[in-house]
From Swiss-Prot:
This protein's record includes keyword Lipoprotein: no
InterPro entries: Anhydro_N_Ac-Mur_kinase, ATPase_NBD
Protein name: Anhydro-N-acetylmuramic acid kinase
Pfam families cross-referenced by the UniProt entry: AnmK (PF03702)
Organism: Burkholderia lata (strain ATCC 17760 / DSM 23089 / LMG 22485 / NCIMB 9086 / R18194 / 383)
Enzyme Commission number, as recorded: 2.7.1.170
Reaction(s) this enzyme catalyzes, per UniProt: 1,6-anhydro-N-acetyl-beta-muramate + ATP + H2O = N-acetyl-D-muramate 6-phosphate + ADP + H(+)
Domain of life: Bacteria
A Gene Ontology BP annotation from the UniProt entry: peptidoglycan turnover
Biological function: Catalyzes the specific phosphorylation of 1,6-anhydro-N-acetylmuramic acid (anhMurNAc) with the simultaneous cleavage of the 1,6-anhydro ring, generating MurNAc-6-P. Is required for the utilization of anhMurNAc either imported from the medium or derived from its own cell wall murein, and thus plays a role in cell wall recycling.
Pathway in which the depicted protein is active: Amino-sugar metabolism; 1,6-anhydro-N-acetylmuramate degradation; Cell wall biogenesis; peptidoglycan recycling
Record keywords: ATP-binding, Carbohydrate metabolism, Kinase, Nucleotide-binding, Transferase
The family this protein is said to belong to: Belongs to the anhydro-N-acetylmuramic acid kinase family.
MF terms (GO), sorted A to Z: ATP binding; kinase activity; phosphotransferase activity, alcohol group as acceptor
Length: 382
């Protein structure tokens, strides 16, 4: 039986699951979390379910135009959702929950195209299948309403960051180092929350590590630590017009992909693989630091989440880049604020499901450039 809510509870209060598979496409992060109006969210369980290489290959292939895309996308979506369901069952088991105790699952899907300038963003998913496999309400398709309102549909996490990480009197930056880097600027005194994508992060770092180490990522940044930053290559990478574009802006593998990197490398004589990795690490750090210097110069603290939070070489590079940019900010992970970095993105989509259930906006128009704040998502009942 569903748990009886206290008399002062909001009708949307309860336990939600959040699922996020990002641009690294290595697997899905999930959380089970209790939301109550006026209280901090309480995480009841977390899980990570990896993707088989065959699924990763299918998802990577869908990043670029190809033959028979509709069939390939549909099959990949079904395979993806079976892994989502495994994650949900693991969360349910770990937290000791019955299906009736779960209000809804908030699921992002897997981005395969992000072209808001053309009026669309595409996250492959099969929420109806997930509802069938879990017998829980599913809320999905969070980005398209923001795009329909003229926004970028990304980033969506800043509204959640403001709720959980904001602090009166202190300007903070939350930096997500996933496949793509993005920042949320939380003003300490008045002003609008802002946020946008800065550029590539693990998407290119992981690609290069896979190509030269045969491993899915550069464990602890050790590969990059063996190399030296190649300054002319770094300058060429930073010459990409996206870095100079003003916010609101968002990006993804449509731009920052292996073909982009190879085209840049073609202008240089042989560069040692470890030097390329060191340079890509510097690219991530410098592109983030420059945006912070330009848009949040008064920031005193940067809190990192995402997979890059586990890369000490990347975090040190970010500290160095901030000093070089004249920003005297400390760099820590969101664990310092009580939220493990690997949970943040999945928590954000559980929160978006909570907001949808309450029929409250999930975006920030000041972040995405939409015509206004909108209720995001679509419901697939169990």
């Amino acid at each position: 039986m569903p748990q009886r809510q206290p008399q002062n509870a909001h009708p949307a209060d309860g336990i939600y699951f959040g699922l996020m598979s990002g641009t690294s496409m290595d697997g899905v992060d999930g959380v089970a979390v209790r939301f109550e109006a006026g209280k901090a969210p309480v995480v009841l369980a977390e899980a990570f379910v990896g993707f088989a290489q065959s699924l990763r290959d299918a998802l990577f292939a869908l990043q670029q135009p190809g033959d028979d895309e509709i069939d390939r996308e549909s099959l990949a979506a079904n395979a993806l959702v079976t892994r989502y369901a495994v994650c949900c069952h693991e969360l349910q088991r770990t937290a000791g929950l019955s299906r009736d105790e779960i209000r809804a699952i908030g699921v992002h899907g897997q981005t395969v195209r992000h072209r808001p300038e053309r009026g669309y963003t595409r996250q492959i998913n099969n929420p109806a299948l997930l509802a069938e496999l879990t017998q829980v309400d599913v809320i999905a398709d969070f980005r398209s309403r923001d795009v329909a309102a003229g926004g970028h549909g990304a980033p969506l996490a800043p509204a959640f960051h403001a709720t959980v990480f904001g602090a009166p009197g202190e300007t903070r930056v939350v930096c997500n180092l996933g496949g793509i880097s993005n920042i949320t600027i939380l003003p300490g005194e008045g002003g609008d929350v802002r946020g946008f994508d800065c550029g590539p992060a693990n998407a290119l770092l992981d690609e290069w590590a896979t190509r030269h180490l045969g491993k899915p990522y550069d464990d602890g940044g050790k590969f990059a630590a063996r190399g030296t930053v190649h300054a002319p290559l770094l300058d060429a990478l930073l010459d990409e017009p996206y870095f100079a574009a003003p916010p609101p802006k968002s990006t993804g593998r449509d731009l920052f992909n292996p073909a982009w990197l190879d085209a840049k490398l073609a202008a240089f004589a042989q560069v040692a693989p470890e030097d390329v990795q060191a340079t890509l690490t510097a690219l991530t750090a410098v592109s983030v630091a420059r945006e912070i210097a330009q848009h949040a110069a008064g920031c005193k603290a940067v809190f990192v989440c995402g997979g890059g939070a586990r890369n000490p070489v990347l975090l040190d590079a970010l500290r160095h880049a901030l000093r070089e940019a004249g920003v005297p900010a400390t760099v820590d992970t969101t664990a310092t604020l009580g939220v493990p970095p690997q949970q943040v993105e999945a928590l954000a989509f559980a929160w978006l499901a909570y907001r949808f259930t309450a029929r409250q906006p999930g975006n920030l128009a000041t972040v995405t450039g939409a015509a206004g704040n909108r209720v995001l998502g679509a419901l697939y009942p169990r």
